[in-house]
Amino acid sequence: MLKIKRVPTVVSNYQKDDGAEDPVGCGRNCLGACCLNGARLPLYACKNLVKSGEKLVISHEAIEPPVAFLESLVLGEWEDRFQRGLFRYDVTACETKVIPGKYGFVAQLNEGRHLKKRPTEFRVDKVLQSFDGSKFNFTKVGQEELLFQFEAGEDAQVQFFPCMPIDPENSPSVVAINVSPIEYGHVLLIPRVLDCLPQRIDHKSLLLAVHMAAEAANPYFRLGYNSLGAFATINHLHFQAYYLAMPFPLEKAPTKKITTTVSGVKISELLSYPVRSLLFEGGSSMQELSDTVSDCCVCLQNNNIPFNILISDCGRQIFLMPQCYAEKQALGEVSPEVLETQVNPAVWEISGHMVLKRKEDYEGASEDNAWRLLAEASLSEERFKEVTALAFEAIGCSNQEEDLEGTIVHQQNSSGNVNQKSNRTHGGPITNGTAAECLVLQ
């Protein structure tokens, strides 16, 4: 059994250290049976992309999209909780900078994110673990930390209900604040919260997250997922999401097409990036894209391979990043210099948003340091090929690279050999939010 000790991220004000005793009675307005009767939350029912038959097509109209209602709802409710003092610190006061270099890694100094918590022991060699109701889970959050219910509607129409009962017989998916935010608008999407699902990907839940990315209609709103063994803190199914008004380095990396599924989903490998990763995009519909990624994730879970997911570009791109940092840490194989930073490379860090806890690390942040840290999380080339072969077998695809002209795609104009680490090249801004530069729903 492999274990590591680390300081867990506090996502709720009701999250206690392991071993802390519960007070007599509930003492809070939670989602348990003691408090649920009469509970109400706004309900946002988004367009059902499956039932509406919407497909992914290219638009050439350079039209700035209007602010989506979901975006205004998320930020409005988040700001309300900020004004009510529900967050552990003011994330808007955290210093942030783009690290000089070709990749544009983003560094944030966040000294308050892990304060006043003891290191906790985590098992890191078992991706699938049973839900344990005795430990903190999202039924124990205070209702004031919940923003709204979110679901795919019955048709192609968006519906919003300002005050809807929470139905325990029909477990709702909810959006809640993360009280230790990384960025403005940092929230949690918790699918079917009352079903108490463990942290594992299933087709329905990933599609819900893709629906949310599409409905937000903002390329700077991304959703992320961490499996157990890849720095998930809570074993209760959830995704994270926030706004960052710049492209992630992961999104700018050049790619090489590997294969295309029968349903038209293109699968590519990232080149010249410190963590070996796959990019899924295209397909006949967003459900086809989501289901393809789900099939791969279920395969990785069943084979005990930790991974992270980034849902990008309004749900049109999904990055899958198998990783091994926690395993290497447990085996004593991570360099002491990297361990001293106390950075846990979860989905946001692997995507290029480095959340640093020490001022000296922030002031000395460099592209080489960021690369060195992230490279510790990457599978070896041989192991990555084994993992992709497993995943491709699960979706009935070959993992033989297609020998076609133009399969190496640069996200910006560049020169040099992308396969040589000494000549790292990558993309520039992938989008500025205009319909001319990204796939849009018609």
Curated annotation (Swiss-Prot):
Biochemical pathway: Cofactor biosynthesis; L-ascorbate biosynthesis via GDP-alpha-D-mannose pathway; L-ascorbate from GDP-alpha-D-mannose: step 2/5
Induction of its expression: By jasmonate, ozone and high light. Circadian-regulation, with a peak in expression at the beginning of the light cycle.
Main localisation: cytoplasm
Endpoints of the signal sequence: none
pH-related activity note: Optimum pH is 7.5.
Places the protein is found: Cytoplasm; Nucleus
EC number: 2.7.7.69
EC category: transferase
Gene Ontology biological-process entries: defense response by callose deposition in cell wall; defense response to bacterium; L-ascorbic acid biosynthetic process; L-ascorbic acid metabolic process; response to heat; response to jasmonic acid
Active-site annotation: 238
Keyword Repeat: no
Annotated GO MF terms: GDP-D-glucose phosphorylase activity; GDP-galactose:glucose-1-phosphate guanylyltransferase activity; GDP-galactose:mannose-1-phosphate guanylyltransferase activity; GDP-galactose:myoinositol-1-phosphate guanylyltransferase activity; GDP-L-galactose phosphorylase activity; guanyl-nucleotide exchange factor activity; hydrolase activity; mannose-1-phosphate guanylyltransferase (GDP) activity
Gene Ontology, cellular component aspect: cytoplasm; nucleus
Effect of gene knockout: Dwarf. 20% of the wild-type ascorbate level, due to the partial redundancy with VTC5. Vtc2 and vtc5 double mutants show growth arrest immediately upon germination and are not viable.
InterPro entries: GDPGP
Tissue specificity annotation: Expressed in leaves, stems, roots, flowers and siliques. Highest expression in green tissues.
Reaction equation(s) it catalyzes: GDP-beta-L-galactose + phosphate = beta-L-galactose 1-phosphate + GDP + H(+)
Effect upon mutating residue 238 to N: Strongly reduced activity
Activity regulation remarks: Not inhibited by dithiothreitol, N-ethylmaleimide, phenylmethane sulfonyl fluoride, ascorbate, L-galactose and L-galactonolactone.
Keywords: Ascorbate biosynthesis, Cytoplasm, Guanine-nucleotide releasing factor, Hydrolase, Nucleotide-binding, Nucleotidyltransferase, Nucleus, Transferase
Superkingdom of origin organism: Eukaryota
Assembly description: Interacts with TLP1.
PANTHER family tied to this protein: GDP-D-GLUCOSE PHOSPHORYLASE 1, GDP-L-GALACTOSE PHOSPHORYLASE 1
Record family assignment: Belongs to the GDPGP1 family.
Function of the molecule: Catalyzes a reaction of the Smirnoff-Wheeler pathway, the major route to ascorbate biosynthesis in plants. Acts as a phosphorylase rather than as a transferase. Uses preferentially GDP-L-galactose and GDP-D-glucose as substrates. Lower activity with GDP-L-fucose, very low activity with GDP-D-mannose, and no activity with UDP-D-glucose, UDP-D-galactose or ADP-D-glucose. Highly specific for inorganic phosphate as the guanylyl acceptor.
Protein name in UniProt: GDP-L-galactose phosphorylase 1
